[in-house]
Every structure is written in C-alpha cells, then in structure tokens.
Amino acid sequence: MKSIKVCVVGEGGIGKTSMLLSYTSNSISNEYQPTVFDNYSTLLMHNKKPYNLSLWDTAGQEEFSKLRRLSYPQTDVFLLCFSLINPSSFSNILDSWVQELNENCPNTPIVLVGTQMDLKSNSVILDRLCEKKQLPISTQQGIELSKKINAFDFVECSALTQKNLHLVFEKAIDACEAHQKCQSKEKKKNNKKFKKNCIIM
C-alpha cells in the first residue's frame, strides 16, 4: 500500500480542520479553535489502488509560522486552501502562501482548494460581503489562480455538505502520482545522458 503525506495549509479560520474532520470522520466542529498541529490518517481506494493518506493539519496564523514549517519536510503534496467567502484569504495565496511553500518545498505539487462552498449562496454572508463591497470568489477566479501558481488543479468543496470533498483528496493522489512519474522520467533521461557522456577506457 502506498503512503502519501498530504500537508494542508492556508489562512486560519477558513475551514481546513472542518474539511479534514468531515472527510475522515463525517463530523464537523462548530467551535473555532486555532490548530497548532494535528495529524489524521485515512485509507482509501483510488483507481483500483489502495492508499494510506497521512493528513497534516497546520496553523495558518503568523505566530505559528516556525512551527508550521516543521510539518513541511517529506510532504508529497500540499492542499493550499482559501475560503470562497473570504477574499483576503484568496489574495494571500499569491501574496504570501506560495512564497512560503516555494521557499521550503519548491518541487512539491500543490492542489488549490476553495473551502466553504456551501456559504457562497448564504444570504447573510452575501450581505456581509456586500457591505464591504466584496463578492464570493468565483470558480473562474480559482481556476485562473491555480494556473498562475502552477497548481496541479483547483477544487471547490464543502465540509458541511461534503460536495466535492472526496474529489479534493483524489486530486491530491493524482498530483502526487503525476509528480512522481515526471521525476522518474527525468531520472531516466539524466541516466541516458550520463551513459552517453561516459567513455570506456
């Protein structure tokens, strides 16, 4: 069985922990408590293959920055999250999060995830955003950002309704597998070049 380390990053309070709890245990906590560090594990079948996903939940707050970075080594794929109803969490993907990941794990694949999908049509949320002259993040905006940061894919999901929730983690596996295939091809290519340059005495 293949093991994959999935590290979940993004601003605090955008639903990262709820997403993981909903996926691993079908439960959601209504109380927000900042995560310092949490680890979940789950087994799943994808494309007729068994996988063991090690899910690392991290704190998004700046004060936990050093601690958060300790979770990064040996990560196979990042789920880089923002809230679809929090425009600042969206803009911070490009302003700070991509830079942090590139500094620490420049070659690790990323799946961009928009959380709290169910709240995009919530009238209270829409009124609150309207007061600030803001709108929820559109699917097209997510796709465009995904391309800009060279992410493997973009997925919108809801921890509450579980819409697209399983797709998030399937995409994480796909990203990891695609990256490893690419690395393997590159290695074979380099080996061929090395053999061509070798002179037998």
UniProtKB/Swiss-Prot annotation:
<dbReference type="GO" id="GO:0030865">
    <property type="term" value="P:cortical cytoskeleton organization"/>
</dbReference>
<dbReference type="Pfam" id="PF00071">
    <property type="entry name" value="Ras"/>
</dbReference>
<keyword id="KW-0342">GTP-binding</keyword>
<dbReference type="GO" id="GO:0031410">
    <property type="term" value="C:cytoplasmic vesicle"/>
</dbReference>
<feature type="modified residue" description="Cysteine methyl ester">
    <location>
        <position position="198"/>
    </location>
</feature>
<dbReference type="GO" id="GO:0016601">
    <property type="term" value="P:Rac protein signal transduction"/>
</dbReference>
<keyword id="KW-0488">Methylation</keyword>
<dbReference type="GO" id="GO:0019901">
    <property type="term" value="F:protein kinase binding"/>
</dbReference>
<dbReference type="GO" id="GO:0005886">
    <property type="term" value="C:plasma membrane"/>
</dbReference>
<dbReference type="GO" id="GO:0048870">
    <property type="term" value="P:cell motility"/>
</dbReference>
<feature type="binding site">
    <location>
        <begin position="57"/>
        <end position="61"/>
    </location>
    <ligand>
        <name>GTP</name>
    </ligand>
</feature>
<dbReference type="GO" id="GO:0005525">
    <property type="term" value="F:GTP binding"/>
</dbReference>
<dbReference type="GO" id="GO:0006909">
    <property type="term" value="P:phagocytosis"/>
</dbReference>
<keyword id="KW-1003">Cell membrane</keyword>
<dbReference type="GO" id="GO:0003924">
    <property type="term" value="F:GTPase activity"/>
</dbReference>
<feature type="propeptide" description="Removed in mature form">
    <location>
        <begin position="199"/>
        <end position="201"/>
    </location>
</feature>
<feature type="binding site">
    <location>
        <begin position="115"/>
        <end position="118"/>
    </location>
    <ligand>
        <name>GTP</name>
    </ligand>
</feature>
<comment type="similarity">
    <text>Belongs to the small GTPase superfamily. Rho family.</text>
</comment>
<dbReference type="GO" id="GO:0019953">
    <property type="term" value="P:sexual reproduction"/>
</dbReference>
<feature type="binding site">
    <location>
        <begin position="10"/>
        <end position="17"/>
    </location>
    <ligand>
        <name>GTP</name>
    </ligand>
</feature>
<dbReference type="GO" id="GO:0051489">
    <property type="term" value="P:regulation of filopodium assembly"/>
</dbReference>
<dbReference type="InterPro" id="IPR027417">
    <property type="entry name" value="P-loop_NTPase"/>
</dbReference>
<dbReference type="InterPro" id="IPR005225">
    <property type="entry name" value="Small_GTP-bd"/>
</dbReference>
<keyword id="KW-0636">Prenylation</keyword>
<protein>
    <recommendedName>
        <fullName>Rho-related protein racG</fullName>
    </recommendedName>
</protein>
<dbReference type="GO" id="GO:0008360">
    <property type="term" value="P:regulation of cell shape"/>
</dbReference>
<dbReference type="GO" id="GO:0030175">
    <property type="term" value="C:filopodium"/>
</dbReference>
<dbReference type="GO" id="GO:0005737">
    <property type="term" value="C:cytoplasm"/>
</dbReference>
<dbReference type="GO" id="GO:0007015">
    <property type="term" value="P:actin filament organization"/>
</dbReference>
<dbReference type="GO" id="GO:0000281">
    <property type="term" value="P:mitotic cytokinesis"/>
</dbReference>
<dbReference type="GO" id="GO:0005856">
    <property type="term" value="C:cytoskeleton"/>
</dbReference>
<keyword id="KW-0547">Nucleotide-binding</keyword>
<dbReference type="GO" id="GO:0036186">
    <property type="term" value="C:early phagosome membrane"/>
</dbReference>
<dbReference type="GO" id="GO:0042995">
    <property type="term" value="C:cell projection"/>
</dbReference>
<keyword id="KW-0472">Membrane</keyword>
<dbReference type="GO" id="GO:0097203">
    <property type="term" value="C:phagocytic cup lip"/>
</dbReference>
<dbReference type="GO" id="GO:0030041">
    <property type="term" value="P:actin filament polymerization"/>
</dbReference>
<dbReference type="GO" id="GO:0007165">
    <property type="term" value="P:signal transduction"/>
</dbReference>
<dbReference type="GO" id="GO:0007163">
    <property type="term" value="P:establishment or maintenance of cell polarity"/>
</dbReference>
<keyword id="KW-0449">Lipoprotein</keyword>
<feature type="short sequence motif" description="Effector region">
    <location>
        <begin position="32"/>
        <end position="40"/>
    </location>
</feature>
<dbReference type="InterPro" id="IPR001806">
    <property type="entry name" value="Small_GTPase"/>
</dbReference>
